[in-house]
């Protein structure tokens, strides 16, 4: 995931000042741009010198061949005149005046200079890339410039009644319908581990079927992705911070051969966006085939580092969940990807409108965007039991930022194009099932149970097509109030004092 290097090169029409400004708007280090420009300038100088040295080496070989053909004496003198050691000014005429033995010596020295130059070039290329991969995509003009998403995310529109309040939160409701085992899940899988069971399994499957059917009717191809990716491929679709904060690493045998003891490093996917992004890696996509639209379906795995203490109960923020994802490869021309961006968020909105979930759409501030996103809109549903908006959907246009690293090019072949172009890539959540279940539970709760949204009823089993009944009391109703806790603790303290007094009296009687 990187920007076009030509954007940093003034002689190629680039504007480093524009990228520096983008970094500042993202509240990231603009000095990375200057470091990259310096490393790139030195790299280009080094490559130019290496090209000239290779030409000189070929000239040496050609001159030796001509002299051998003429049967000129090889000579034994390997001393090199001072002016010949200046390779930048060395010409064919200068070489022709030397003996074969001297030219061979010159070729050997040129070889050493090439190796030294190549070593320097590799070092500069690595330095340049380290800076390049930490510089974010160019921002869309409509992105709010701020580093405080809590205060400055811009609300674009609201749908439904986002003021209504209801009694229970999703944390209680998953227990009341007997669809969740949290304590046992944590014993088996660790923190945030859970078992989804009974009615909520049916509700989850109903959401998956409905989401896939909706996307299928809009020209999306359903695709079930691998759950893990090779390290070298994951590096092309994920930014560096994700490896520490989000991704799980798995290590296994590198081969199915019993005598092979090598081990392979892979990463569990955090979203189906990652493997789908790599699906057309190293390909040329024809203009007439675009847009290519995928409805990704996968289990997702996230470490949630940095979320300590947030949403620790229930199923809203968990390490493992199912998700349906919109993913699109688009033309880079005629504003096509931005038209697709609007279409994808509209598709998500219509999905949640059909489920009757109130929401608002927020334009995410520049400081909270990941490197790849040029712009991101979130759909945040209203949770009437929690009294808060919670994120269900993220929709991003990454323009050509991801495609460049994955080498997914636009057009026929390089020979038929004046300049290599890259497709634009977009992604948007359709339905993260556990979060959507939480939103349904809070919005559709009644005194007797959860009313099943009309669009999901055909996917539910008999007896659960209209109402999911409450079968357990709410945990919050089982917890004593602060006043009750205080009274209980006071009674226990008083009882202890009485017991101690009785013991002292008994001791006095015994002694008497």
Curated annotation (Swiss-Prot):
Keywords, alphabetical: Acetylation, Aminoacyl-tRNA synthetase, ATP-binding, Cytoplasm, DNA-binding, Ligase, Nucleotide-binding, Nucleus, Phosphoprotein, Protein biosynthesis
Amino acid composition bias (Polar residues), ranges on this chain: 500-512
Entry's localization field: Cytoplasm; Nucleus
Entry binding sites for L-serine: 271, 302, 325, 427
Compositional bias annotation for Basic and acidic residues: 479-499
Gene3D superfamilies: Bira Bifunctional Protein, Domain 2 (3.30.930.10), Serine-tRNA synthetase, tRNA binding domain (1.10.287.40)
A Pfam family recorded for this sequence: Seryl_tRNA_N
Record remark on domains: Consists of two distinct domains, a catalytic core and a N-terminal extension that is involved in tRNA binding.
Listed name of the protein: Serine--tRNA ligase, cytoplasmic
Species of origin: Rattus norvegicus
Gene: Sars1
